[in-house]
Amino acid sequence: IAVGKTFGHAQGAKIYAQKLSGLEGTGDSGTGIAIADAFDCIKGWHNAKSGANAGRPTVVNMSWGYNTTHNDLPSALNYQGAAKSGTDIDTLAELRTFKFQAYPGSSPYKTPNRVASVDADVDEMIDAGIHICHSAGNSYYTHDLTTGSDYNNTYTVSIGTGYYNRGSSPYSVNAFNVGNIDSTAYSSTQDQKRVDSVHGPAVDIYAPGTDIMSACSTTNNKSGQNYYANSSYKQVNISGTSMAGPQVAGIL
């Protein structure tokens, strides 16, 4: 999407991939790089660029994030400073009224979570001159800024209490936090976000991320089809902010 040789936005870019610890594929657990080490590697590589590469931008696209997993729905919320419990939040629809996004069949539930050390590492990369694109997520949640009325909303479940409208690490206010534009327009002159895209004041930009055709593995678990130009390769139609983020990364 970002750097494809035929349709990519940055066709002359060089691609480097990292396998991160905890994000490995099936059968290769324990083979990824620790996240802090991966970020240090990127920063060190960026700072050491010389010659013809010295003036080339470093753009990092990240499509992963932290969540807290819990099997139960909240017993209490604090929504914009007001306590909610009991019959206030005893249905999924009522929870969503207070911007806690739980949907039928989604147990175990996953709520976005921030990790301060990871966010600090992101800021260090940005301070070094690296451009960061982060896919905002597909969890329906509102992601608010520190000054917003939803930033301090909390939920309480059996494993503890957490914030639910602060988004997911890796995050920085100085990064590009990318939401997903739907493939169906709102009107003849306006686009609209996809319904499950994370949204809100902390989402900086939206890019096309629905019904995106891109390359995939010939042994992938998606519903791939033969690449139209060469049947030895595969392509797939897929949706999510993971498809939107690379659009921005490629433009940068």
What are these regions (language model features)?
Residues 1, 5-7, 11-27, 75-76, ...:
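Peri-catalytic substrate-binding/gating loops that frame the active-site cleft of hydrolases
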Residues 1-37, 50-59, 68-73, 127, ...:
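Subtilisin-like serine protease catalytic core
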Residues 3-7, 40-48, 65, 123-130, ...:
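Sec-exported extracytoplasmic/periplasmic mature domains
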Residues 7, 41-55, 113, 120-124, ...:
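Alpha-helix termini
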Residues 9, 14-19, 56-64, 131-135, ...:
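Structural recognition of the beta-strand scaffold that forms the well-ordered cores
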Residues 21-23, 65, 139-140, 182-185, ...:
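Acidic glycine-/aspartate-rich tracts in secreted/extracellular proteins
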Residues 43-113, 135:
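Short acidic, glycine-rich surface-loop motifs adjacent to enzyme active sites
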Residues 155-252:
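Extracellular S/T/G-rich loop segment that most often corresponds to the catalytic His/Ser-adjacent loop
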